[in-house]
């Protein structure tokens, strides 16, 4: 018997702005039939609990979404069963969540009820010491990421200064016309679900882009930071939402304000950015190389700074 499909993604990330959470976008309470908020400390089995439920549901041919933890990509922060409008969320730090519509929508599952207090009490000092060390190392890692962002921003600005903005606007116009010209603006805008397709983790960069790009129509934008891929994606996203289409917007795991991938489920269409750190092996309907929009003479003058 065919099993349900599993989609993988992240709702939070270790970014240049520190830990950045989009937990509120996992499932809106307006849509949800039930949201289970799971409490309990590290190691209490929250991720295993969600994986076991996912396995049971996929065996019953339900599709599921695995929302992975950026601090441990093998663990889950949440599980979504879209057809049933049910979500299970890890409600502990760094994304502490409490029921907003208790009883009617939200319900707490406290796995902390099943730990052995006496055994943990014996390890009290060791647990506190390790927790403090983890906090210090995370803070240090975020300082490094913030420092790297300034170099990234400088390079992006230089590439942006050499970009042909007329051609960039033309590309944005071509895609919005191709996709949406037959659709008038809607009375009610579409909704945006904002998450991450990749994350910086203790195992390095983990990406689920290929896992998400399983649509009939896929367009790949190739380019450097600053070459305008995100600008065109934002234009397409805005046009889709204005016409009433719901979208899934996946942002950069390093720069959480930069749009990298876009899915418009209703028209079975996806856009993916391909660069140095991530690309998709999906069969694309069309690839657009944004590096061709850069002025070669301007880039050559910036060469020493960019190489640095």
Predicted feature residues:
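Short secondary-structure boundary/capping segments within folded domains
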Residues: 27-28, 78
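An accessory alpha-helical subdomain
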Residues: 126-179, 308
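Conserved nucleotide-sensing/catalytic segment adjacent to the nucleotide-binding pocket
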Residues: 2-20, 55-119, 125-126, 240-308
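Glycine-rich phosphate-binding P-loop
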Residues: 35-54, 203-206, 214-240
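N-terminal low-complexity, Ser/Thr/acidic repeat segments characteristic of secreted
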Residues: 34, 184-188, 217
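N-terminal pre-Walker A segment at the start of P-loop NTPase domains
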Residues: 1-27, 166-210
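Extended intrinsically disordered terminal tails
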Residues: 2, 24, 69, 153-162, ...
């Amino acid at each position: 018997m065919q099993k349900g499909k599993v989609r993988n993604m992240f709702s939070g990330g270790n970014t240049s702005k520190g830990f950045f959470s989009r937990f509120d976008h996992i499932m809106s309470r307006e849509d949800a039939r039930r949201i289970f908020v799971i409490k309990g400390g590290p190691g209490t089995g929250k991720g295993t609990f969600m994986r076991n439920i996912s396995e049971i549901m996929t065996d019953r041919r339900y599709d599921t979404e695995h929302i992975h933890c950026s601090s441990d990509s093998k663990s889950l922060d949440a599980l979504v069963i879209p057809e049933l409008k049910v979500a299970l969320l890890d409600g502990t730090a760094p994304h502490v969540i409490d029921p907003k519509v208790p009883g009617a929508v939200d319900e707490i599952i406290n796995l902390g009820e099943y730990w052995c207090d006496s055994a943990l009490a014996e390890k009290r000092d060791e647990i506190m010491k390790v927790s403090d060390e983890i906090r210090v190392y995370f803070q240090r890692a975020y300082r490094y990421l913030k420092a790297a962002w300034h170099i990234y921003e400088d390079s992006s600005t230089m590439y942006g200064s050499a970009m042909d903005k007329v051609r960039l606007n033309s590309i944005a116009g071509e895609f919005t016309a191709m996709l949406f010209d037959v659709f008038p603006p809607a009375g009610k805008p579409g909704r945006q679900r904002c998450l991450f397709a990749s994350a910086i983790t203790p195992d390095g960069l983990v990406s689920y882009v290929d896992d998400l790009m399983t649509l009939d129509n896929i367009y790949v934008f190739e380019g450097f930071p600053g070459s305008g891929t995100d600008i065109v994606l934002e234009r397409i996203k805005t046009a889709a939402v204005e016409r009433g289409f719901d979208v899934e917007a996946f942002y950069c795991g390093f720069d959480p304000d930069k749009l990298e991938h876009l899915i418009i489920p209703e028209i079975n269409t996806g856009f993916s950015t391909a660069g140095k750190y991530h690309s998709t092996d999906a069969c694309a309907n069309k690839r657009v190389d944004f590096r061709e929009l850069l002025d070669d003479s301007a880039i050559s003058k910036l060469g020493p700074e960019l190489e640095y």
